């Protein structure tokens, strides 16, 4: 089994409780937003592979100053774990920064920690990363922070919050299963002939996934 978690937002105590309930799960995955409000990461009791959300400590990610139990999955890179091919496209979509090379995304220092966080454009994904993902083949799991289109929040009554580049990757790469977060709502849909699941906040539910069939069970807390 593979365990899958939605946005954590520093709630590592709950993550450890979930892991303790499932000692049979060798590793876990997460769709981003791990850090707490101070940008801190805590060790957990099983390997937790994760992509970036828009609320992270991007300096810690860049310097690999992370607990060993939290291996980071960079955008547009395939990671193989126990035979499972995993890749991700973390962060959010910003049209004004989409064509910027990832290495050139600015991260200026501001007068406060919050202002510095908001000014850090490393929270976004860019086109060069999307293109790398579109060229991937034989993916088992594809993780994103953003949702594909159409995705309507608040039970379908809100505006379309999905992002077209996610659909482009799903259409090109055709992973066996797609997981996303960011909206803290459970959803189950098919996009571009790919099963696409929106994960709830980790405080409410998580998934157990059969790596052979990609069938899943949503477990509520």
PLM segments and residue spans:
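Active-site-proximal beta-strand elements of phosphoester/diester hydrolases
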Residues: 1-9, 83-92, 141-145, 195-200
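Conserved beta-sheet core of the metallophosphoesterase superfamily
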Residues: 42-57, 68, 87, 149-219
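Conserved acidic residues
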Residues: 26-28, 140, 176
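Active-site-proximal loop/helix segment associated with metal-binding centers of metalloenzymes
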Residues: 84-156
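Catalytic cores of nucleotide-sugar-dependent glycosyltransferases that transfer UDP/GDP/TDP-activated
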Residues: 8, 32-34, 110-125, 159, ...
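Core catalytic region of metal-dependent phosphoesterases/phosphodiesterases
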Residues: 3-81, 172
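Structural motif
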Residues: 80-82, 191-192
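Short hydrophobic/charged patches on amphipathic alpha-helices used for structural packing
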Residues: 16-19, 131, 167
């Amino acid at each position: 089994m593979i365990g899958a978690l939605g946005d954590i937002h520093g709630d590592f105590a709950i993550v450890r409780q979930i892991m303790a309930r499932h000692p049979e799960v060798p590793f876990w995955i997460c769709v981003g937003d791990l850090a707490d409000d101070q940008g801190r990461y805590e060790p957990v009791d099983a390997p937790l592979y994760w992509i970036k959300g828009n609320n992270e400590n991007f300096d810690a990610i860049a310097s690999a100053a992370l607990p060993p139990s939290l291996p980071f999955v960079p955008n547009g890179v395939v990671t193989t774990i126990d035979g499972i091919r995993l890749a991700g496209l973390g962060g959010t979509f910003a049209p004004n920064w989409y064509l910027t090379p990832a290495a050139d995304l600015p991260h200026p220092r501001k007068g406060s920690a919050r202002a510095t966080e908001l000014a850090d454009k490393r929270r976004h994904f860019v086109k060069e990363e999307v293109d790398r993902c579109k060229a991937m083949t034989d993916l088992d799991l594809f993780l994103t922070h953003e949702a594909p289109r159409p995705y309507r929040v608040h039970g379908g009554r809100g505006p379309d919050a999905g992002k077209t580049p996610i659909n482009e990757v799903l259409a090109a790469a055709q992973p066996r299963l797609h997981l996303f977060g960011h909206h803290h709502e459970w959803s189950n849909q098919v996009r571009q002939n790919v099963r696409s699941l929106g994960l709830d906040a980790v405080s409410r539910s998580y998934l157990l996934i059969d790596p052979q069939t990609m069938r899943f069970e949503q477990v509520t807390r």
